[in-house]
Amino acid sequence: MVTYKDAGVDIYKEDKVIRALASQIKFERTDAIKPADLKGHYAGAIEFGDYYLVLCTDGVGSKMVVAEMANKFDTVPIDMIAMNVNDAICIGAEPVALVDYMAVEDITEDIASQIGKGLNDGIKESNINLIGGETASLPNMIKGVDLAGTVLAVVKKDEIVSGKEVKSGDLIVGLRSSGIHSNGLSLARKVFFDIANLDVNSKLSHGKTVAEELLTPTKIYVKPVLEMIKQVNVKGLAHITGGGFRKLKRLNKEVCYKIDELPEILPIFKEMQKLGNVADEEMFKTFNMGIGFCVIVEKEDAEKIIEISNHHNIPAFVIGKIEDSVEVNGETKKETVLVEYNNKKMIME
């Protein structure tokens, strides 16, 4: 069975690398501009009067490789923006501005125009301003194009959503993804191009081409989630990206997240799993599996969350609940994420 590690990505090694880097960061300012206590969360923030200024930075990873194969660059900028703004809203912050960074080996005016169109589409959907950026020509360092960005967001101090209030009995509402989003592309490319010997124009069994599926842009959840925060007591927010539902542990680490009511898995994931003979556990640790964002609320508020999401044309479902502990093979587990799928219980460690 093929794994993400076989495709060149070791998420556990990445965790260790991040910890090694973070262990060396010891300096903090000693004046009134202090960082918020959000270590390990989706976004970083500093105090600024009655507000927190929030920063997120991210790129599109190897999705750009598929864009180059298909010679289609107008959607990947939307992915870059989505990866940033969707992280920012996880603490209740409203994204307001973006700066982008593009590193190129060589680039044509046509590709630049496509990227510009995608940037405009992404900032429009996110309701943010693009206020600057950098384009670096690095022919001796890079092949093709890499695109990343940093988003600035703001939130009032008394309105931050940290996830610390998540408790047993709360429900987890899952918002539909548009597909693969921007994570797991290395494994997807290995399955489709190396194992199945397909190309970007090959049609999959459900009718779409490989390029159409892999280049569908990441869903931007800014508008519905900000509306939810205004209308409902939202207790936790999670952007489901690399690592899948493991991301829920970024919120309250003292509870269990039990995912046991998943909707139908999207065709792209079924196709990939079949072609690559990928295990269920590997799929759920690598991909969003059709749920791109989670909202945690008290039981009586779940229907309102679903109503708001549907109003924004994003299907939403109660996919699970918060518990103090879960039972797996006769063993009691605490402080974990449990996914039940195909009559199988999988711990997402």
Swiss-Prot record:
Entry-linked Gene3D superfamilies: PurM-like C-terminal domain, PurM-like, N-terminal domain
EC numbers listed for it are 6.3.3.1
Catalyses which reaction? 2-formamido-N(1)-(5-O-phospho-beta-D-ribosyl)acetamidine + ATP = 5-amino-1-(5-phospho-beta-D-ribosyl)imidazole + ADP + phosphate + H(+)
Where is this protein found?
Cytoplasm
Protein origin, superkingdom: Archaea
Pathway of action: Purine metabolism; IMP biosynthesis via de novo pathway; 5-amino-1-(5-phospho-D-ribosyl)imidazole from N(2)-formyl-N(1)-(5-phospho-D-ribosyl)glycinamide: step 2/2
| GO terms for cellular component | cytosol
Keyword annotations for this protein, in alphabetical order, are: ATP-binding, Cytoplasm, Ligase, Nucleotide-binding, Purine biosynthesis
Major site of localization recorded for this protein: cytoplasm
CDD domains xrefs = PurM (cd02196)
MF terms from GO for this chain are:
ATP binding; phosphoribosylamine-glycine ligase activity; phosphoribosylformylglycinamidine cyclo-ligase activity
GO biological-process terms attached to the record:
'de novo' IMP biosynthetic process; adenine biosynthetic process
* Annotated InterPro entries: PurM-like_C_dom (IPR010918), PurM-like_C_sf (IPR036676), PurM-like_N (IPR016188), PurM-like_N_sf (IPR036921), PurM_cligase (IPR004733)
Name of one Pfam family that matches: AIRS_C
Q: Which family does it belong to?
A: Belongs to the AIR synthase family.
Provide the protein name.
Phosphoribosylformylglycinamidine cyclo-ligase
Source organism of this protein record: Methanococcus maripaludis (strain DSM 14266 / JCM 13030 / NBRC 101832 / S2 / LL)
